[in-house]
Amino acid sequence: MANHNQENSQQSDMAEKLIAVNRVSKVVKGGRIFSFTALTVVGDGNGRVGFGYGKAREVPAAIQKAMEKAHRNIVTIDLKGTTLQHVITGKHSGSKVFMKPASEGTGIIAGGAMRAVLEVAGVQNVLSKAYGSTNPINVVRATVSALVNMHSPEGMAAKRGKRVDEILG
């Protein structure tokens, strides 16, 4: 019971953002059946981020399902203060994203779905660009995969059995 309350308190301090709501239809013999999809991201602003995609007959139910999935799919990323460790790229389906660390005071230079992911993850200074498909679902997946594949120099040095200054050159 105490563990469940601890999970609820952790979820309550997460920032939640709704990225997209879409009406979709299923065509049946009697006509069309409409339902709604929602894409959301959650994060603690300190390197933890997750996204969720929910579908239901009503908008609030779709958003609720998406938020629950986002809370279940949280990943941790290695940030360097308020920016990224190094230049990263990510790809999912037809979407490609490019992100580059920026100096203090630059802000989040990103569009649409990528901006929402970076904001809730706690990245405050970044230069980024989305190429190819700008479908929000694919852009979010590409952004999260790029962030997950980013590693700190300390982590890479430990993996390779070298010192940090050897890694950085």
Swiss-Prot record:
Which keywords does this chain's UniProt record carry?
Ribonucleoprotein, Ribosomal protein, RNA-binding, rRNA-binding
* One Pfam family per UniProt: Ribosomal_S5
**In Gene Ontology terms, what is a biological process of this protein?**
translation
Q: Which residues form the S5 DRBM domain?
A: 14-77
* GO cellular component entries: small ribosomal subunit
Source organism, top-level taxon = Bacteria
A single GO molecular-function term is: structural constituent of ribosome
List the HAMAP family. Answer: Ribosomal_uS5_B
The record's listing under PANTHER family reads:
MITOCHONDRIAL RIBOSOMAL PROTEIN S5 (PTHR48277:SF1)
Subunit structure comment from the entry: Part of the 30S ribosomal subunit. Contacts proteins S4 and S8.
| Domain remark text | The N-terminal domain interacts with the head of the 30S subunit; the C-terminal domain interacts with the body and contacts protein S4. The interaction surface between S4 and S5 is involved in control of translational fidelity.
Instruction: Report the family membership.
Output: Belongs to the universal ribosomal protein uS5 family.
Instruction: Read off the NCBIfam families from this record.
Output: rpsE_bact
Entry function: With S4 and S12 plays an important role in translational accuracy.
Q: Per its record, how is this protein called by name?
A: Small ribosomal subunit protein uS5
Q: Which organism is it from?
A: Colwellia psychrerythraea (strain 34H / ATCC BAA-681) (Vibrio psychroerythus)
